[in-house]
Amino acid sequence: MTRKRKEQVTYHKGQIPNRTYKSTIFIRLLEDKGKLLQVYNALNGTHYTDPDLLEINTLENAIYMAMKNDVSFLIDSRLYLYEHQSTYSPNLPLRMLLYLADLYAGMTEDKNLYGRKLVQIPPPQFIIFYNGQEERPDSQVLRLSDMYAAEEETHKLDLEAKMLNINAGHNPELMDACQILWEYAEYTDRVRRYVRETSIENAVERAINECIEEGILEEFLRKNRAEAKHMSIYEYDQEKHLRQEREESWEAGREAGQDALNHLYSMLEKQNRTEDILRAINDPEYLKQLMEEFGNSCEKIAIKPTEGQE
């Protein structure tokens, strides 16, 4: 007989849970244990049918202040952390390590960590479901060790997170094995296609209507229509905002680099080093040497604060 487990909510000691976060549609879908089990089976090649085998752990903490985009759960004495991301970041392994530490702290809160008896903890597995608009491979592994500032022959601590691209057209085998992932990818793809022709509000409304008619996320969208529309608009606006911030940062960096380059050429010209200027234009390595030669003065130009940041 299968023993039913209660949902376990864990909090970091001394921390007030943040109840102002917004959830993503993806995570709202996986709050349904049946759908979460469907995703788990597809990823692991298993055939579990009892959703109560899952023991969901939720943790509200400062790492995710704006958007609730994760779900963690126990099954077969293993801890799984699923995270949804619409923007790629190489820093995800570190964020997951911090999150894992909080989860373990909650799980062992009543255990004697100074005692002689071994305190057992579930081994973790990390999966990132990516559906951003930046092109990424179907699957890739992100490692904590890639973030280390110093090289080591062997790493004393590492963490691997597998990132899966769940955009329409990616990971066809996974999509075939998991209906809920395919439906989510289809819904998201329609919103993005339609927003090219109309406002985000109209694009979401059209996608919701079509998906309900065609049986795509039908039950969820019927029951949570207003919430789904609000979340879709919020996710789109947040993704657009982050994309604009990256573009503005890139443009600011490009302008700073051009200022430094102009300053270098001006200094070379004052020293009558015209040949060095001509060579640097066609030789990136030589340009790098010159930038190092005039490093301090060029660096001051490159990091000149923008207006309002002084």
Protein language model features and the residues they cover:
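Elongated, amphipathic alpha-helical interaction scaffolds
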Residues: M1-E310
